[in-house]
Amino acid sequence: FGVNPNNYRKADFWDLRNLRPPYWLDCDEHYQFEICQLTSKEIFGFQTSHQIATNDLPKKASPIKWKIIHETLRTWGENVYCLSSFKPDNTKDQVIAVSSFFGMEHNSVNGGKIPMSRVIKCGKYAKFHFVGHKEQYQQFSNTIYMCILPKLNLIRREGEDIEYFHLASVQKQQNNESIVDLYYYIPVL
């Protein structure tokens, strides 16, 4: 492969074409996708950060993230964006620092102004649609990165992953479990 994992994570782009997916991934899974151009858009919300050990990747999803998404959808009463960036932690080996911004298109909730904003950067993105249980979502995300992007010859460029959660996610139920409905955008070259 020609580069160590730490330097790979620090690169401006991630070329996953030469990686072999783990045995537990179903690379025959097909997800609806399209290549699109996004325009810049300002969203308003709040920032969170956490760390995850690289040996917990890619099977482990943050339970805190799901709680935040569910509560934000319920409280704000509208669709929610989650912009996430990933980079090696500067102080610890084998740790990824994850920064997420949760936001919406309006700058106020219940009459109160939201002071923090972030701009979704314009550019080329691979857009995927997911509807299913949150437990299935991690498999979806892993399959996109480890199987679908390489199969399509797409290289992830620097930028934030964008998840756009639909309000209906809070209301949909199947077997007493919430169904997640979202679009997932990955910045690509």
Regions found by a protein language model. Give the residues of each.
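A solvent-exposed interaction/effector surface
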Residues: 1-189
